[in-house]
C-alpha cells in the first residue's frame, strides 16, 4: 500500500509571487493568508488564520469528499461532524485571497496540478447570518470564524 502526501510549498510560493510581486504595497496584497489543513479539520485550521471580526462561509457541497473518508465514516460509524472536526476531508490547503484574485489563484494552482476552486467567501461577522456549524476560538487562537453549512458530496 502506498500513501501519498501532497506538498504545497512550491505552489504557495508561486501563488505569492504571482499575486503579490516583490515590492508590492502591503495595503494592496491579494494573498491574505494560507491555511494548511492538518489535524483539527478544515474549519478550525481556516478560522485560525482569519482575523477576529471575520467569518468565512464554506458550503460542504462545494467539493467531492474522497472515498476513503466516506469508508471511514460508514465502517467506523463516525458522524460527519466528528470527521470534519478531525480530518481535512480532501482539502489540504486553503489560500485566502482578495475577491478579484480568486480566479487567478485557482488557475495557477490547477496549472501546477493542484485541484482548486472557490471554497467560500469571507465576511465581516456583523454583516453575516450563519447557516450551519460555526467554528471559532480553536487551539487558543482568538481569530476569526468559519461557518460550515450544507451537505457533503461523496460522488
Regions found by a protein language model. Name each.
Residues 2-155:
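Glycine-/charge-enriched secondary-structure boundary and capping motifs
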